[in-house]
Amino acid sequence: MMHFTSRTPAVSAVIATNGKRPELLRVAVRSILEQSYRGFVEVVVVFDRVEPDHLEDIEVGENRALKIVSNTRSGGLAGGRNSGIIASSGEMIGFCDDDDYWMPSKLTQQVALWRENPEATAISSGITVRSGGQDIVRLAPERATFADFLRSRITEIHPSAMLYSREDLLGVDGQPARIGLVDEELPAAYGEDYDLLLRATRHGDVLSVPEPLILVLWDRPSFFSGKWQSMVDGLSYILRKFPEFEQDPKGLARIAGQIAYAQASLGNNKEARAYARSALRRDPKQLRAWAAYVVSTGIIKPATLLDLVQKTGRGL
């Protein structure tokens, strides 16, 4: 729940980066600083295990701030985001990947929606995915519950679109936070955004502006290509952490199918087929499980299927 102290509460946007995309990083930072939102906007850029780029060529306008910090916690995305959250000052906190872009009215529309629905646990929006030379609009559901997230990751609700309440992430007046920080125990931070959404929706729903308010660039090598073990470890961790998946056979089948595909991509064909069977017992239409069987035969390479899926603006 968001407790509004003004009509235009201060917003902090955290960008965690490894510094390898300096030009895209600048585009992301400027897109946040140039928001039409009338309230205070702060961008916190967190450099992870690299020398910080102080972005001195970026103009910072009135009622805007740019803060450059280093990741002082565990290495990787989760620790980077947490370092940024702790260093931030806004009543609302959002994230932006270092190669994504916020549309000018993002904060204005999201804060207005939250003011109308203060009981919401977080606010999101639709996205535009740029992939294969085309832009694909993916609209998020106007309301998403804990049960919805057990059934589906709902990839239209992207981490770069999210806004959370500061007190929900950090607590207030010595009281523990309802949601808490990003989980740094997740192996390779795989699924850290999904874990955060599951924890958040235990306390209330995520509402989304029914417009694409961020641009997500997928015209680059897949983050998951070659990182299949992280996928196996991360998803297995999430299943252990959220026993509620046992209450939703299709949701459990979805994750079992993802693990099956990752195991097949690693060449662990016995494990892949075991997870695929488990998934198909719960949901015979689980395509990831069928895909795992195909990959386990060696007929098609895992990266080939993944690239085909990503060209539709969807993830595995």
Map each language-model feature to its residues.
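Short, acidic, metal-binding catalytic loop of nucleotide-sugar glycosyltransferases
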Residues: 30-40
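Flexible acidic/His/Gly-enriched loops in nucleotide-sugar-dependent glycosyltransferase catalytic domains
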Residues: 63-64, 79, 107-179
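N-proximal low-complexity "stem/linker" segments adjacent to membrane-targeting elements
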Residues: 1-31
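Glycine-rich, basic loop-to-helix element that forms the pyrophosphate-binding segment
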Residues: 71-88
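A conserved acidic beta->alpha catalytic loop
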Residues: 31, 47-57, 73, 97
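Catalytic core of nucleotide-sugar-dependent glycosyltransferases
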Residues: 212, 216-219, 224-250, 269-282
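Short aromatic/hydrophobic "clamp" motif used to bind/position activated sugar donors
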Residues: 93
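Conserved nucleotide-sugar donor-binding catalytic segment
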Residues: 14, 143-229
